[in-house]
Curated annotation (Swiss-Prot):
Protein name: ATP synthase subunit c
A Gene Ontology molecular function term of the record: lipid binding
Family statement drawn from the similarity comment of this UniProt entry: Belongs to the ATPase C chain family.
SUBUNIT field: F-type ATPases have 2 components, F(1) - the catalytic core - and F(0) - the membrane proton channel. F(1) has five subunits: alpha(3), beta(3), gamma(1), delta(1), epsilon(1). F(0) has three main subunits: a(1), b(2) and c(10-14). The alpha and beta chains form an alternating ring which encloses part of the gamma chain. F(1) is attached to F(0) by a central stalk formed by the gamma and epsilon chains, while a peripheral stalk is formed by the delta and b chains.
One annotated Gene Ontology cellular component of this protein: plasma membrane
Site residues by UniProt (Reversibly protonated during proton transport): 92
Amino acid sequence: MSSFIDITNVISSHIEANLPAIASENVGSLANGAGIAYLGKYIGTGITMLAAGAVGLMQGFSTANAVQAVARNPEAQPKILSTMIVGLALAEAVAIYALIVSILIIFVA
């Protein structure tokens, strides 16, 4: 848990350090709100990519639990493996949707 907190501290300090540089790129258009919209696009993209990170974390947990289940009951390995693969494919769809939404936010919005 402390490594997750360390990672979030590094990310937040990086954002704090680079926020003025990002805002200064559109300093001329801050009066009409375009600069804030520019910042909002990238903040929104970062939030959508949190879904992809959560998917990766949960896929690791589900795979670890499947390995433990097979270790406890080796006869059930084919059923556990097929169920795990279907579950991981459905979970990966969420990460792909998050990536698509992020790309749309950056290039279309």
